[in-house]
Swiss-Prot record:
Name of this chain's protein: Large ribosomal subunit protein eL8
Top-level lineage group: Archaea
Gene Ontology CC: one annotated term: ribonucleoprotein complex
Species name: Nanoarchaeum equitans (strain Kin4-M)
Record flagged with keyword Plastid: no
Compartments where located: Cytoplasm
GO molecular function: ribonuclease P activity; rRNA binding; structural constituent of ribosome
């Protein structure tokens, strides 16, 4: 197992990461998402983000290093996924996405709530 970058504060099981990709896809189709670190940062600062997704393989890590602390400060749940390429694909863009934010989960509200609960349990460990 490769060492995680310093901004990764907790381990996300693969099963949960797959649910996160599914949530991003569903929210993109039936709700509203923001893609990329600048858009994600703005959504958190404006209080619009319901969940922030951060890729673990971002290089240089400074691109997303501020997001966990900003989310903590604003009370926004956040979760990690292993691949910025997969996150970009789930978000419907042809390039990788270092991060994304769920603004409106659309038809995936239950999945959003389930993921937030799982993240809270992971962070409590």
């Amino acid at each position: 197992m490769a060492e995680k970058p310093p901004y990764v504060k907790f381990e996300v099981p693969e099963e949960l990461a797959n649910k996160v990709y599914e949530l991003v896809r569903k929210a993109r189709e039936t709700g509203k998402i923001r893609k990329g670190t600048n858009e994600t940062t703005k959504a958190v600062e404006r209080g619009q983000a319901k969940l922030v997704i951060i890729a673990e393989n971002v290089n240089p890590p400074e691109i997303v290093m501020h997001l966990p602390a900003l989310c903590e400060e604003k009370g926004v749940p956040y979760v990690y996924v292993p691949s910025k390429e997969e996150l970009g694909k789930a978000a419907g863009i042809n390039v990788s996405a270092a991060s994304a934010a769920i603004i409106d989960a659309g038809e995936a509200k239950d999945l959003l709530e389930e993921i937030i609960r799982s993240v809270q349990e992971l962070k409590a460990k």
